[in-house]
From Swiss-Prot:
GO molecular function: alkanal monooxygenase (FMN-linked) activity
Domain of life: Bacteria
Record field: catalytic activity: a long-chain fatty aldehyde + FMNH2 + O2 = a long-chain fatty acid + hnu + FMN + H2O + 2 H(+)
One Pfam family recorded for the sequence: Bac_luciferase
Organism classification: Bacteria, Pseudomonadati, Pseudomonadota, Gammaproteobacteria, Vibrionales
Subunit structure: Heterodimer of an alpha and a beta chain.
Protein name: Alkanal monooxygenase alpha chain
Organism: Photobacterium leiognathi
Function: Light-emitting reaction in luminous bacteria.
């Protein structure tokens, strides 16, 4: 079993940027002290939904403060920056951390990112797939090459060389299209915390079928699952503190992107729009209903309840790499206390999939 801590770097109402950044750093250090395997970061721009716009810089800070903790991105918004620049950042972190950096990517969901950085949002899937292949191939060969599909430049040698033979990578996968693309290449995917156990199981079945058809060993691919987590002997307190955080967090999320508005005609995001329509039909756009939905899917409550929920998804998916977000627990002291309760009262009792 492996356990990660994901930090959203969200700015709750009433908190300053300095408070959010100080907490981000301390949670990274605490992750090593509590024996988490990985500390994960997320990229966001121009919104209080997340203050870490440059994950290479953020990860370098945490890597420099720790000795054994892996630090990763979940993920880099790949289409919005030049692949050569990203590859140099990636390789430098890989070398300076002696292989402790994990390169996780996403295609991006926030329209302002694409407008400001000068990228067509409707091309995000094609660019993400293209750039990811270029970077991963280049990390092995030492040469960055493009076929001119989305960007064109002459072949260049990239430095430094990779510290590891194979740089750890992953990609958040929500749609069938992304799942299929990753499966064809045998690449690890990250499963969302907002889908049900049956949906996770179906996603893994699709992935495994396609990956096996393409000759990949499905038992040797390091997928991960994400959860929102609050561990407390008082289940009502755990649910209450998550509600207080998530009600503001959800509002910030929907305000950060216009993809869910009826007037939005951006192509290429049919899965996300369909998921939102399902939420509307089920009443989950109502804040209370959506918080109930989230708490039912995620390990929020007593240690026993948290074990039951996570183990259920482990057995359904075969995934034993678990990533948890603890920021919904309130103050920094309460967040770290919940992290500690998880590592002492939940993690030791989780078992590899049946």
């Amino acid at each position: 079993m492996k356990f990660g801590n994901i930090c959203f770097s969200y700015q709750p109402p009433g908190e300053s940027h300095k408070e959010v950044m100080d907490r981000f750093v301390r949670l990274g250090v605490a992750s090593e002290e509590l024996n988490f395997d990985t500390f994960w970061t997320l990229e966001h721009h121009f919104t209080e939904f997340g203050l870490t716009g440059n994950l290479y810089v953020a990860c370098a800070n945490i890597l420099g403060r720790t000795k054994k903790l892996n630090v990763g991105t979940m993920g880099i918004v790949l289409p919005t920056a030049h692949p050569a620049r990203q590859m140099e950042d990636l390789l430098l972190l890989d070398q300076m951390s002696k292989g402790r950096f994990n390169f996780g990517v996403v295609r991006g969901l926030y329209h302002k990112d694409f407008r400001v950085f000068g990228v067509t949002m409707e091309d995000s899937r094609s660019i993400t797939e293209d750039f990811h292949k270029m970077i991963m191939d280049g990390s092995k060969s030492g040469v960055l090459h493009t076929d001119g599909k989305n960007i064109e430049f002459p072949d260049v040698n990239v430095y430094p060389e990779a510290y590891l033979d194979k740089i750890p990578t992953c990609m958040t996968a929500e749609s069938a299209a992304t799942t299929t693309w990753l499966a064809e290449r045998g690449l690890p995917m990250v499963l969302s915390w907002i889908i049900t156990t049956s949906e996770k199981k179906a996603q893994m079945e699709l992935y495994n079928e396609i990956a096996a058809e393409h000759g990949h060993d499905i038992h040797n691919i390091d997928h991960s699952m994400t959860f929102i987590c609050s561990v407390n002997e008082d289940p009502e307190k755990a649910e209450s503190v998550c509600r207080d955080f998530l009600s503001n967090w959800y509002e910030s999320y929907t305000n950060a992107t216009n993809i869910f508005k009826d007037s939005n005609q951006t192509r290429g995001y049919d899965y996300h729009k369909g998921q939102w329509r399902d939420f509307v039909l089920q009443g989950h756009t109502d804040t209370r209903r959506r918080l109930d939905y989230s708490n039912n899917l995620n390990p929020v409550g007593t240690p026993e309840k948290c074990i039951e929920i996570i183990q259920r998804d482990i057995d359904a998916t075969g995934i034993n790499n678990i990533t948890l977000g603890f920021e919904a627990n309130g103050s920094e002291q309460e967040i770290i206390a919940s992290m500690e309760r998880f590592m002492t009262q939940v993690a030791p009792y989780l078992k590899d999939p049946k």
